[in-house]
Amino acid sequence: MTSTSPTNPAAASSTAARTSAPPTTAKPSPTPTPTAIPPVSAQAKAAGLVDVRTVVPDAVIDLRYATTNNFTKTQLYPANARCQIHNSMAAGLKTAADALRRQGLVIVFWDCYRPHAVQVQMFQIVPNPDWVARPTNYARSHESARSVDVTLARAVTGGSCPVAMRIQNHCQLDMGTGFDDFTPRAFAFATNDVSTAAQSNRALLRHAMNTGGITVYEGEWWHFDGPGSDYGRPILDVPVN
């Protein structure tokens, strides 16, 4: 849930066991046929933002902050919020999605561009910088649309997926924790109380994202930063929908 990723000393201790992406024999998914995506707002276009579906047409969009299914238990985005990214992330996300598609997997997007006002609201709800990044006078990470929160899923086959793991005809992979988990198990390279299967799935996600030049934030296995995400920029005035 970070925007400017907060310092978390415990995250560093979890980096010892860094596993390589495991081989997979899953049947590749067909390349999706692009569908017409409504243009982003004039403000978003001027800021260099694009709808992620224009570069990852099979993206599964599950923006948690557009619902109450998030750590604040409050709906922070309008229901029609879109996953918008800065165009500097587009090529990298396409590369990652292409690699995962060959393994029968798709990317599920939990958060993308996050308005500054929402970051302020988050910190007001949970004023703990170990959990939520303290807002500043500059836009970084999610606030600059250069970070995404993601997981992996594959197409559901029959009744093989637990109901809690289903999302839009897909089944999410076991990653060891859910989104916005505030325990040490959420650290990207955690091994304690994280199954071998979940560690392998995290490694698979990291490897694919790394091929696109997108790197994990070690404090949260789901948070990935694009080029220049940590550079402070003017705060955007862009609607999330």
Can you say where each PLM-predicted feature lies in the sequence?
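Extracytoplasmic cell-surface/polysaccharide-interacting catalytic and binding patches
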Residues: 2, 7-12, 16-110, 124-219, ...
